[in-house]
Design a protein with these regions (language model features):
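Non-catalytic, C-terminal membrane-associated alpha-helical segments of glycosyltransferases
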Residues: 235-328
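Acidic donor-binding segment of Leloir-type glycosyltransferases
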Residues: 47-92
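Short beta-strand-to-loop acidic/aromatic patch adjacent to the donor-nucleotide binding site
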Residues: 115-127
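Conserved donor NDP-sugar-binding/catalytic core segment of glycosyltransferases
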Residues: 92, 127-163
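Short, well-formed alpha-helical segments that are part of the catalytic scaffolds
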Residues: 37-50
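Conserved nucleotide-sugar donor-binding
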Residues: 173-188
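Active-site nucleotide-sugar/metal-binding loop of Leloir-type enzymes
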Residues: 101-118
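Catalytic donor/gating beta->alpha subdomain of glycosyltransferases that bind UDP-sugars
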Residues: 190-258
């Protein structure tokens, strides 16, 4: 990679794009790993059923729930033939990160991806606007360089106000990853470790493809609980976030900047410190890291450009270079 931030592996991206039919169908499959989501899953189930473009299939993996989730899922699977529920043995705890992706792949293994043009990994703690998937599909159809895409997550405060979770533009949100199936295969799918939902976007750029999210009213969605709070507490989630940054190969100076930025999110200050603590603890204990050294070089260049130009502008610069590489 000769210049700063130029897309790596663009030949693979070119080959991938050359095989994409501009008239590809709108058949998409949803795979949803879940555990103990009785408080939220009805909102997600109902908002998907209300979509203007519904999924061709929806596989839900019940990852050992101990609440009423299995009963609720059985109710919906009986009513709607395109919903399939797969029970998984209770491991005794919620295991985000690798546990979520293991459950995701358990569901994906029951699907023939050749039957679908798109794949969505969807959490069951979201509330979607009715035209969400229609708008996402329009975006994918308009841009053949686009590997994944999502809207932005918002929290609903007690007074009814919506506040942004301040997610960056450089990737689809982990709770609702919508992928072109060919692109998902091209990057080798999701890594089974904390940080999977950051690694995949950088893998897309290394392949000469675009991963992004956008904040528009028609694709804003409600996160029914704060990001990172599903396992034990926000503090645990932020420490896990820091570990994920270490695992994927982020530089300490970049994580320090991220931690400072997140000090302005609830819980104020503490959340940012949790990210930094998680990273430093992983570093000092010699925790394993993602072993792809080419990926790590790409990541560090991207992070440096993000600090110099800002994350939004850095993502735009990368995406512009990717599109230019395909026009040549």
């Amino acid at each position: 990679m000769g210049r700063l931030g130029a897309p790596e592996g663009s030949v693979s991206g070119m080959e991938l794009l050359s095989g994409i039919d501009r008239k590809e169908s709108r058949r998409y499959v949803i795979v949803s790993p879940c555990r103990d989501e009785e408080r939220f899953m009805r909102q997600t189930l109902e908002s998907v059923l209300a979509q203007t473009v519904q999924p061709a299939a929806w596989v839900i993996v019940d990852d050992g729930s101990t609440d009423r989730s299995p009963r609720i899922l059985a109710e919906y699977a009986t009513k709607y033939p395109f919903i399939k529920v797969i029970p998984r043995e209770n491991r005794g705890r919620r295991a985000v990160g690798p546990g979520v992706i293991e459950a995701f792949y358990m569901g994906l293994d029951t699907v023939n991806l050749d039957d679908f043009d798109y794949l969505c990994k969807l959490d069951l703690d979201l509330e979607l606007p009715p035209s969400y998937f229609e708008k996402v599909l329009e975006e994918m159809e308009a841009d053949p360089c686009l590997a994944n895409f999502s809207g932005k997550p918002y929290l609903r405060e007690k007074d009814g106000r919506l506040t942004s979770e301040r997610f960056g533009d450089e990737n689809a949100v982990g709770a609702i990853k919508f992928y072109r199936t060919a692109a998902f295969r091209s990057i080798g799918g999701f890594v089974r470790q904390v940080g999977w939902d950051g690694i995949d976007g950088h893998m897309c750029r290394m392949k000469g493809l675009i991963a992004r999210s956008e904040d528009r009213p028609e694709i804003r969605f409600i996160h029914l609980r704060q990001m990172g709070s599903s396992q034990e507490s926000i503090w645990v989630g932020r420490v896990r976030w820091g570990f994920g940054k270490y695992y994927m190969g982020s530089a300490l100076y970049y994580v320090a900047a991220v931690a400072f930025y997140r000090m302005f999110d609830k819980p104020y200050v503490v959340g940012g410190w949790g990210i930094l603590y998680g990273y430093l603890r992983a570093m000092l204990t010699g925790a394993p890291r993602f072993e792809d050294k080419v990926f790590r070089r790409h990541l560090r260049r991207y992070e440096l450009e993000s600090l110099v130009f800002g994350k939004r502008r850095a993502a735009d610069r990368y995406h512009r270079r990717i599109r230019l590489s395909h026009e040549r």
